[in-house]
Amino acid sequence: MSTVFKKTSSNGKFSIYLGKRDFVDDVDTVEPIDGVVLVDPEYLEGRKLFVRLTCAFRYGRDDLDVIGLTFRKDLYVQTKQVAPAEPTSIQGPLTALQERLLHKLGVNAYPFTLQMVANLPCSVTLQPGPEDSGKPCGVDFEVKSFCAENLEEKIPKSDSVQLVVRKVQFSALEPGPGPSAQTIRSFFLSSQPLQLQAWMDREVHYHGEAISVHVSINNYTNKVIRRIKIAVVQTTDVVLYSLDKYTKTVFVQEFTETVAANSSFSQTFAVTPLLAANCQKQGLALDGKLKHEDTNLASSTILRPGMNKELLGILVSYKVRVNLVVSYGGILGGLPASDVGVELPVILIHPKPSPGERAVATSSEDIVIEEFMQHNSQTQS
């Protein structure tokens, strides 16, 4: 069975159908958005049916718009006339989903295909605070359908239907050596230095997957290492309208392993950054959220060569920090000396779905329609 997402306009005159709401950017190309619009023929008579894809960056609250301040910038807009078909338009072959939907919905259904350009950002939301209301800041994508005599006509909200979709990046695990870092620190009254080395087997990790961090310490000093602290830090660069940078710790744990003076130590630590442990952190970057679905920490931004960073709006990156808490030995053992640390880059992303992971309908009876109403959703066959 295949699930199809449906949303109907407030006036009940037309509905939009999509086979999915997540569309994959594999860095070189982006999946097309294929769907169908069902419209009341009497309502359409004398007018045109349009479908529009908008990628927008919102960096302020909705309620501020009414006082003349606009905190939204459209990064990309694509509009297609679906009915009547334009003489110069070239309709590509129907997808399997469109064929099944047209068979199920009848002659008043019209197929459409929208192709995102490759240089658009992925869907990102900045986690709002407890007092915030309205749409959160971030980058979102919206598919909208409406009827009008022309594109200059002002469209009442009740005469259109919008469905939010997401652009997401998937990645396969890259073979080859993972990131590594090393530092050497000398201390006063110690003839030999402290050496810290940390590395990972690979840079790319999937959301929810434990990250194995290997730590090797050669402590040739007269200092004692009291604790090993490992943190995962998210850095969010808002590059569209300012040079704001937000740094949030999404995982931190102190391990009580002690490394005595003039000794060595080696161990692997498992760390797992999760949104569940960071739900109250305002400004944390998340993957774009659909109202009825949970989300996760934002995926790392993967840049194409020569890409204009400003067009992406928000850039997200992660790093693992390994810090040693070093103290003096002997009678001064309780006094902290300093921290010794290194950083490792890490990419958090979704795994590529297998080819057979998504069911494909073989007939119109294999379709289950999930309908989204104004404030809730329900499933119907």
UniProtKB/Swiss-Prot annotation:
The keyword Transferase is assigned to this record: no
UniProt record, GO biological process: endocytosis; signal transduction; visual perception
Single annotated GO MF: opsin binding
Keyword Disulfide bond in annotation: yes
Location(s) in or outside the cell: Photoreceptor inner segment; Cell projection, Cilium, Photoreceptor outer segment
Transmembrane segments: none
A Pfam family annotated for this UniProt entry: Arrestin_N
Cross-referenced InterPro entries: Arrestin (IPR000698), Arrestin-like_C (IPR014752), Arrestin-like_N (IPR011021), Arrestin_C-like (IPR011022), Arrestin_CS (IPR017864), Arrestin_N (IPR014753), Ig_E-set (IPR014756)
One cellular-component annotation, GO: photoreceptor outer segment
Tissue and organ distribution: Inner and outer segments, and the inner plexiform regions of the retina.
Keywords on record: Cell projection, Disulfide bond, Sensory transduction, Vision
Function according to Swiss-Prot or TrEMBL: May play a role in an as yet undefined retina-specific signal transduction. Could bind to photoactivated-phosphorylated red/green opsins.
Subunit structure: Homodimer; disulfide-linked in response to retinal illumination. Interacts with CXCR4; the interaction is dependent on the C-terminal phosphorylation of CXCR4 and modulates the calcium ion mobilization activity of CXCR4. Interacts with GPR84.
Similarity-based family: Belongs to the arrestin family.
Name listed for the protein in its UniProt record: Arrestin-C
Gene label: Arr3
